[in-house]
């Protein structure tokens, strides 16, 4: 093909053939672009897994069961000295814009517009920071403006899916909506960084009239209200549906799977609770362990059931 393209004018009758070959080659290049799944876990400690992130297993590694993390590590690469901010918003704002917290200056968690979330300190004065989060467009005070890599993927032919926790911008700012960042599909993502409830029986933080009981109510999962479906599982089911739908499109996909787990509250996932109680854990310890294993099960479901890499 390259030889034909080097001499496009040498043989006029071959021009159509050359163009067809070029178009075919472009299609093949598109087909070779990989599908991408980025799996984000919230508030997870480096020892809160059965996969050691040190030279040997720690006592905490022996408590938890995350077989799918182990499987993924064997198939790929581990970064045992990587850094993430200790608070949700800075990490997620860094991820979406490609800038570190020292640059975007979202140094604490965001929620309500023009409202700082710092605790008062008797000694230290907290410097001004971007408490409205990040955005792709100017016009909002105390906001870092940056380009989303998701938008770049979308602009280059990717089908983009957001599932779970967003937490990029404060309420009533452009950045609160995952669509603003280039996601074509948004499942349960909004401004809040936490959740009111993991439980379908509690409508994930909505009352019987369908109204949220707090700003932390998880949106968009009404079909699971009143069921025993843990929110981690509900998000996984919806992500798989979105991926199966994406199979019909002649384009690669990007899925940002951002579980609310393991953020508080420590609601127990009944599927795994008894196992950890038998290990001698307290109620809170066992509930925390179930959040971890539920997250790992979600990872396994995506590894086993997502469309094959392109």
Predicted region positions:
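Formylglycine-dependent
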Residues: 111-159, 166-253, 259-268, 277, ...
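Bacterial Sec-dependent N-terminal signal peptides
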Residues: 1-31
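Active-site-proximal N-terminal segment of extracellular/periplasmic enzymes that hydrolyze or transfer
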Residues: 24-77, 166
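Catalytic metal-binding/acid-base residues of hydrolase active sites
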Residues: 44-45, 100-101, 166-167, 260
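Short, structured active-site-proximal loop/turn typified by the sulfatase FGly-forming signature C/S-X-P-X-R
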Residues: 57-92, 98-103, 159-161, 181-190
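Conserved small/polar residues in nucleotide/adenosyl-binding loops
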Residues: 304-309
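Loop/turn elements at helix/coil->beta-strand transitions in domains of secreted/extracellular proteins
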Residues: 33-36, 75-80, 156-160, 249-255
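Short, solvent-exposed loop/turn and secondary-structure capping segments
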Residues: 47-53, 84, 91-94, 105-108, ...
């Amino acid at each position: 093909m390259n030889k034909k393209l080097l001499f496009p004018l040498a043989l006029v009758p071959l021009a159509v053939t050359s163009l067809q070959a070029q178009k075919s080659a472009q299609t093949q290049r598109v087909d070779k672009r990989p599908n991408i799944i980025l799996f984000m876990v919230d508030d997870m400690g480096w020892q809160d897994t059965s996969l050691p992130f040190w030279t040997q297993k720690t006592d905490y590694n022996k408590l938890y069961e995350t077989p799918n993390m182990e499987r993924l590590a064997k198939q790929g690469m581990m970064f045992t000295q990587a850094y993430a901010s200790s608070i949700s918003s800075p990490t997620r704002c860094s991820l979406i814009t490609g800038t570190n917290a020292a640059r975007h200056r979202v140094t604490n968690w965001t929620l309500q517009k023009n409202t700082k979330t710092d605790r008062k300190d008797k000694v230290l004065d907290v410097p001004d920071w971007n408490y409205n989060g990040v955005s792709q467009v100017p016009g909002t005070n105390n906001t870092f403006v940056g380009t989303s890599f998701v938008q770049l993927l979308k602009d280059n032919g990717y089908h983009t899916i957001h599932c779970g926790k967003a937490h990029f911008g404060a309420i009533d700012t452009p950045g609160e909506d995952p669509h603003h960042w280039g996601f074509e599909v948004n499942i349960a993502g909004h401004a809040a960084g936490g959740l009111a409830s993991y439980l379908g029986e509690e409508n994930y933080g909505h009352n019987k009239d369908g109204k949220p009981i707090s700003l932390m109510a998880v949106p968009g999962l009404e079909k699971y209200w009143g069921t025993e479906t843990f929110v981690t599982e509900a998000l996984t089911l919806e992500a798989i549906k979105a991926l199966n739908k994406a199979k019909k499109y002649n384009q690669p996909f990007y899925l940002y799977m951002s579980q609310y787990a393991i953020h508080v509250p420590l609601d127990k996932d009944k599927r795994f609770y008894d196992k950890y109680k038998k290990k001698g854990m307290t109620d809170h310890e066992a509930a925390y362990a179930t959040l971890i294993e539920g997250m790992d099960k979600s990872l396994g479901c995506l590894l086993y059931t997502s469309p094959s890499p392109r």
